């Protein structure tokens, strides 16, 4: 946990506290900006080691995203750490694995365009457009081996948000036109485009 100094938390946090309510109805106070990973570690090392995500205020959140202030402000945040034993964790694990698969495909088949990679009730998939040839089941062993290598490397997942124009440019710079279409479709669904 970061150290507190006379001007607040050394990592830029404020000295405001946020109350969380655990599944056993225990209420604990944490500095605003605390992450679910830090809360899990405070509960126990074993829990932190197996944590997949968390549920805060009814939404699944990643472990490194600071908790948002509750609404209404004086109420505790209902909070639960998700582990592989929780049904909600399965979708998170499948979503993460789809990202690993996409990265493996991009490494093995440079120039591949990624379309959509949703989770399903049966697992996950990724629609891809390979510039040289269609991918087939014969490619699965190599993709699985590259996925295993990526998982063993334990590279962190990094979530970041960008304003829409920057997000569009980011995926354009990656030459991922289907992702630009996806952003535009989302904007249209909200009546923005």
Give the positions of each predicted feature:
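Eukaryote-biased recognition of intrinsically disordered, low-complexity regulatory segments
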Residues: 16-26
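Short, contiguous acidic and Ser/Thr-rich linear segments
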Residues: 24-34
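N-terminal catalytic cores of NTP/NDP-binding nucleotidyl/phosphoryl-transfer enzymes
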Residues: 32-36, 80-118
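Short amphipathic, charge-patterned alpha-helical segments
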Residues: 34-46
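Short acidic beta-strand-loop surface patches of small beta-rich interaction domains
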Residues: 51-65
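Eukaryotic mixed-charge, acidic/polar low-complexity intrinsically disordered regions
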Residues: 61-82
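Short, hydrophobic beta-strand segments
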Residues: 78-85, 122-133
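Non-catalytic interaction/regulatory segments
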Residues: 120, 130-193
């Amino acid at each position: 946990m970061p150290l507190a100094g006379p001007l607040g938390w050394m990592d830029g946090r404020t000295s405001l506290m946020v109350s969380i309510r655990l599944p056993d109805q225990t209420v604990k106070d944490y500095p605003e900006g605390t992450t679910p990973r830090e809360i899990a570690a405070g509960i126990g090392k074993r829990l932190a080691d197996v944590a997949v995500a968390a549920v805060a205020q009814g939404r699944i959140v990643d472990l490194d995203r600071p908790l948002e202030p509750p609404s209404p402000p004086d109420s505790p945040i209902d909070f639960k750490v998700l582990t592989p034993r929780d049904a909600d964790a399965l979708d998170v694990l499948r979503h993460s694995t789809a990202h690993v698969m996409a990265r493996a495909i991009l490494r093995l088949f440079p120039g591949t365009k990624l379309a959509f990679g949703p989770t399903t009730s049966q697992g996950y998939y990724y629609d891809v457009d390979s510039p040289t040839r269609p991918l087939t089941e014969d490619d699965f062993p190599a993709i699985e081996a590259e996925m295993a290598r990526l998982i063993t490397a334990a590279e962190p997942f990094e979530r970041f948000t960008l304003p829409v124009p920057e997000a569009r440019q980011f995926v354009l710079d990656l030459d991922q036109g289907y992702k630009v279409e996806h952003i535009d479709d989302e904007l249209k669904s909200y009546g923005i485009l």
